[in-house]
């Protein structure tokens, strides 16, 4: 089978690459290797387009084109090691070829020319998936130029993203902490923020 994971349970729910990628990361991260887990892995690989279609991933199989968020989360599910590893020595940005994971990484690298992944095909910037890609590239030991640009962008935009309207976005801080670990950046001096105390002070009993 090629079972994927849907965003919500129930009749009519269709599997998507984002939900499947994060679910696979969680299941494989705790050592699960059942038939269903292997089917989700197959589903993720089938979401990746060939180089002639950019090498990115589609959100759902019937979509007409690739999706940046889906691309980042499929690669995160397939290749990221969690908790995030300390910074590895990274090879150059990858090129599209015969390996699907590398092709997907190549697509993401091509989308990180400014250091920030966009919400393509929608508007806006996606700092969460930028951070996810930093963590994944570090696990894969590739993408040196992309990672360097991305961590600078994350530091520059950390406060605006993680402290929007004066409220702590704990999910954003969590992604920034993982990106900091993956690049040997100080979590206590990250873009003018102490990520550790920002997160702990936001916790409620």
Residue spans of the language-model regions?
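Non-catalytic propeptide/linker segments at domain boundaries
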Residues: 85-89, 93-95
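An alpha-helical repeat/solenoid feature that recognizes helix-turn-helix modules
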Residues: 1-38, 53-87, 118-145, 163-190, ...
């Amino acid at each position: 089978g090629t079972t994927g994971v849907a965003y919500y349970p129930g009749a009519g729910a269709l599997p998507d690459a984002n939900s499947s990628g994060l679910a696979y990361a969680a299941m494989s991260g705790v050592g699960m290797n059942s038939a269903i887990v292997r089917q989700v892995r197959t589903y993720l690989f089938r979401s990746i387009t060939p180089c002639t279609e950019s090498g990115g991933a589609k959100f759902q199989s019937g979509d007409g084109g690739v999706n940046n968020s889906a691309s980042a989360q499929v690669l995160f599910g397939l290749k990221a090691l969690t908790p995030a590893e300390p910074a590895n020595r990274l090879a150059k940005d990858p090129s599209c070829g015969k390996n699907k994971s590398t092709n997907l990484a190549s697509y993401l690298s091509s989308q990180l020319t400014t250091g920030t992944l966009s919400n393509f095909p929608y508007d806006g910037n996606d700092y969460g998936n930028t951070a996810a890609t930093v963590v994944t590239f570090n696990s894969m030991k590739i993408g040196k130029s992309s990672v360097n640009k991305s961590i600078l962008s994350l530091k520059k935009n950390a406060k605006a993203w993680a402290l929007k309207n004066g409220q702590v976005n704990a999910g954003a801080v969590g992604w920034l902490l993982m990106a900091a670990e993956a690049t040997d950046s100080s979590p206590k001096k990250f873009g003018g923020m102490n990520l550790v105390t920002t997160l702990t002070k936001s916790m409620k009993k």
